[in-house]
């Protein structure tokens, strides 16, 4: 850019303007600490619990005897009760921002039942849904919603469009609620990431634009004489900043989720895990288009922190001061004895089912590298899918998106728990017939960055993909070679015929065109198979031991090297 000051200034202007709305904040209290003439509202909040019912280690994985155990639902419950009591005089309410489903064997085996048991014990003032609440379709969500309703817990998603979904037609999801605390009426609006229907198994359900929905619902609440409006969002830190900027004329604060963002102000000098990356201050203050200051909070994930923010409002309903921080749920936090007792029967079920041996492996089945390149877990999983449909005269390819995987499998015995936790989303192992040109488009899309700046590298069986990441978007797939679907005895590879049709085994999630894999919708035929975990389990039982895998199925060319 040397010699082009005009361009430099323009780029600097763009950078500054993109951050101008965000104020990096810490506690904002008057020097004399006198807030006696202001109305206090305290928000106690958690998000993205992801089935961490049992205590965890510092990395939010299962805690072992060697670890320092933290978090867990018994500690979270105790901390919430303590905060509700401590801040009762400051009008405390407790909010849950969604994604309580998915993430451990507890959910994989016990689904909505165990989740409902503990969420109803915590009993938030209100909660919204996360995208993972749809992991087992609306049918898997409906009984959970019914239990929340029985417990008197309102579920709020203002931008949820039912589209006559048969499983949710009797659910009592609301756009917003009004609660009265300290003589003031508080409106709470729930909102879910508006592309959830593209990344989750939502059935007929879709999501409307989050910003426009919040604007509309907030205006209606203001017209109804609500004093303060809280947005309970499962949209991500970045999306929440957008909501604050563009819909900030009527809302007062956003309690967020989805991005697992750790917001913290070091000036608070409060304890935290110093290995947790700080993404912004707690609270983050965004200036709206009409110059109002909108605080945003989020409490990372996995029950590792419980957020507590106290806001002070003037008579005009404007936030004048605030203070608070995420409370670290370390091992100094006591565990509630009643919750500990309630965990015992559930834990017994998890241990009994999860510890059964299925097979063994002499190599680590890696998950961490799956997003960027071929990984051993992905290769084994793809082989299992292909094997399920293979017979003496037929063998399909198999492709699995990297986002399908959640946990690696370590060297040693492979258990039921390992099988389920490796890919816990409950997809079916389907078979489709797809044109070669569409398969090429799918391979190209796997290299595109998602909203978290990640690729979704395909894990494959029966084909070989060569990728040149130095090329432009849309031209990164150099070649695809494939085996013959009709000759399972031959492992010879031939160039993909982009006009021919091929048979491909894949997860139903991918076959549905989720995660932007829209070319999958061009399939000319589709057959629904059994649960993916059952297919994976059967394959591991069949081969008994994983001791070697044929790799180099996805070749990522290195800079300066031939790409063939």
UniProtKB/Swiss-Prot annotation:
Q: Which domain of life is it from?
A: Eukaryota
Reactions this protein catalyses: a ribonucleoside 5'-triphosphate + 2 H2O = a ribonucleoside 5'-phosphate + 2 phosphate + 2 H(+)
Question: In the UniProt record, what gene is named as encoding this protein?
Answer: APY
Q: List residues binding AMP.
A: 371, 406, 425, 515
Which annotated residues bind a divalent metal cation 2? 99, 131, 234, 258
Q: Is Thylakoid included in the keywords of this UniProt record?
A: no
- Summarize where a divalent metal cation 1 binds, as residue positions: 48, 50, 99
Signal peptide positions (record): 1-25
Q: What is this protein identified as?
A: Apyrase
The answer to keyword Transferase applying to this record is no
**Its function?**
Facilitates hematophagy by inhibiting ADP-dependent platelet aggregation in the host. Cleaves adenosine triphosphate (ATP) and adenosine diphosphate (ADP) to adenosine monophosphate (AMP) and inorganic phosphate. May reduce probing time by facilitating the speed of locating blood.
Give the UniProt keywords, A-Z: Allergen, ATP-binding, Glycoprotein, Hemostasis impairing toxin, Hydrolase, Metal-binding, Nucleotide-binding, Platelet aggregation inhibiting toxin, Secreted, Signal, Toxin
Family, similarity comment: Belongs to the 5'-nucleotidase family.
Give the sugar-modified residues. Answer: 391
């Amino acid at each position: 850019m040397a010699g082009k000051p005009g361009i430099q200034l323009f780029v600097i202007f763009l950078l500054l303007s993109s951050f101008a709305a965000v104020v990096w904040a810490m506690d904002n209290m008057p020097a004399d600490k006198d807030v006696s003439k202001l109305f206090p509202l305290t928000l106690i909040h958690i998000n993205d619990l992801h089935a961490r019912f049992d205590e965890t280690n510092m990395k939010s994985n299962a805690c072992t005897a060697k670890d320092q155990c933290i978090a867990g639902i018994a500690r979270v419950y105790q901390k919430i009760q303590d905060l509700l009591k401590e801040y009762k005089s400051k009008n405390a309410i407790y909010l849950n921002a969604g994604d309580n489903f998915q993430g451990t064997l507890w959910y994989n085996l016990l689904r909505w039942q165990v989740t409902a048991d503990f969420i109803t014990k915590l009993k938030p003032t209100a909660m919204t849904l996360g995208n993972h609440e749809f992991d087992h379709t609306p049918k898997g969500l409906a009984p959970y919603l019914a239990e929340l309703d029985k417990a008197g817990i309102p579920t709020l998603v203002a931008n949820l469009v039912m589209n006559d979904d048969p499983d949710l037609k009797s659910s009592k999801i609301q756009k917003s609620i009004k609660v009265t605390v300290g003589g003031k009426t508080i409106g709470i609006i729930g909102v879910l990431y508006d592309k959830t229907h593209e990344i989750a198994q939502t059935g007929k359900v879709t999501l409307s634009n989050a910003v426009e929905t919040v604007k509309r619902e907030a205006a209606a609440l203001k017209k109804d004489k609500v004093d303060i409006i809280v947005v309970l969002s499962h949209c991500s830190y970045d999306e929440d900043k957008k909501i604050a900027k563009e819909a900030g004329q009527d809302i007062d604060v956003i309690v967020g989720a989805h991005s697992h963002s750790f917001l913290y102000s070091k000036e608070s000098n409060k304890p935290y895990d110093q290995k947790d990356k700080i993404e912004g201050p707690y609270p983050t203050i965004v200036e709206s288009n009409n110059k109002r200051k909108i605080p945003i909070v989020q409490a990372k994930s996995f029950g590792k922190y419980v957020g507590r923010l106290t806001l002070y409002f003037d008579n005009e309903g404007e936030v004048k001061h605030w203070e608070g921080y995420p409370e670290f749920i370390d091992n100094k936090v006591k565990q509630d004895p009643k919750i500990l007792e309630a965990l015992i029967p559930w834990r017994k079920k998890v241990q009994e089912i999860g510890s059964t041996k299925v097979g063994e492996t002499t190599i680590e089945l890696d998950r961490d590298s799956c997003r960027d390149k071929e990984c051993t877990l992905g290769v084994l999983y793809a082989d299992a899918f292909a094997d399920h449909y293979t017979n003496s005269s037929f063998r399909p390819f198999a492709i699995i998106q990297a986002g399908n995987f959640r946990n690696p499998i370590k060297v040693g015995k492979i258990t039921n728990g390992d099988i389920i936790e490796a890919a816990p989303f409950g997809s079916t192992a389907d078979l489709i017939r797809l044109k070669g040109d569409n398969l090429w488009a799918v391979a190209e899309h796997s290299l595109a960055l998602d909203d978290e700046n990640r690729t979704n590298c395909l894990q494959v069986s029966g084909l070989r993909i060569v990728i040149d990441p130095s090329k432009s978007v849309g031209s990164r797939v150099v070649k695809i070679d494939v085996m013959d679907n009709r000759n399972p005895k031959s492992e010879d590879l031939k160039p993909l015929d982009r006009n021919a049709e091929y048979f491909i085994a894949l997860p139903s999630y991918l076959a549905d065109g989720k995660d932007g894999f829209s070319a999958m919708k061009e399939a000319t035929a589709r057959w629904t198979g059994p649960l993916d975990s059952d297919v994976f389990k059967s394959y591991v039982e069949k081969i008994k031991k994983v001791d070697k895998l044929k790799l180099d199925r996805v070749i990522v060319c290195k800079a300066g090297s031939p790409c063939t």
